[in-house]
A protein has these predicted regions:
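Mg2+-dependent endonuclease catalytic cores in nucleic-acid-processing enzymes, primarily RNase H-like
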Residues: 1-92
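Short, conserved catalytic/metal-binding motifs centered on acidic residues
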Residues: 23-26, 105, 109
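Phosphate/oxyanion-binding active-site loops and adjacent basic polyanion-contact surfaces
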Residues: 3-7, 102-108
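Short, solvent-exposed helix-loop connector elements
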Residues: 90-102
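Amphipathic alpha-helical interaction/assembly segments
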Residues: 93-96, 107-113
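Active-site-proximal flexible loops/turns
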Residues: 33-34, 112-115
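Residue-level detector of alpha-helical recognition elements and their boundaries
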Residues: 38, 77, 98, 124-125
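Acidic two-metal-ion nuclease catalytic site recognized across multiple nuclease folds
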Residues: 114-138
Length: 138
């Protein structure tokens, strides 16, 4: 378990090394402190609160990306494992609720990445390592 300062330092390294324009961070719970620290260090961070509606929207988008073959996962065992434990149910108000019996850190990171590249009026190219690029996009 990393502390917020260590995580912020790692994010700062990645912003520098990969020339990232914006880092999307789950602001729910402890992530709020990470957002504050990142902003203090001039890291281009944007917080996303994982409300029921927001999380449902991001996971609907991910489902559409998979269905339309816009995203592929290869050789990412932990990601596939965690995705396989996701379930959905609906609240009395009809809002979809995404749940997992296991950790969902990898899938949550994936939906944040998908949200990041599709935000705004244009798509952005993500410069990632060849291994991760091949694993995510084939």
């Amino acid at each position: 378990q990393s502390n917020v300062v260590d995580v912020c330092g790692k994010i700062n390294e990645m912003v520098r090394d990969y020339k990232l324009e914006t880092v999307f961070i789950d602001e729910t719970g402890l992530g709020g402190g990470l957002i504050d620290l990142a902003r203090e260090q001039d890291i281009p961070a944007r917080g996303v609160v994982f409300s029921l509606q927001e999380k449902a929207s991001m996971y609907k988008n991910l489902r559409l990306l998979f269905e339309n073959h816009k995203i592929t996962l290869k050789k990412v065992d932990k990601m596939v494992y965690q995705l396989s434990y996701l379930t959905r149910e609906y609240t009395e108000g009809g809002v979809m609720k995404i749940k997992s019996e296991e950790h969902d850190d990898y899938p949550d990171s994936l939906v944040l990445a998908c949200r990041a590249v599709s935000s705004g009026n244009q798509w952005h190219v993500i410069d990632v390592g060849k291994g991760l690029q091949k694993a995510l996009f084939g």
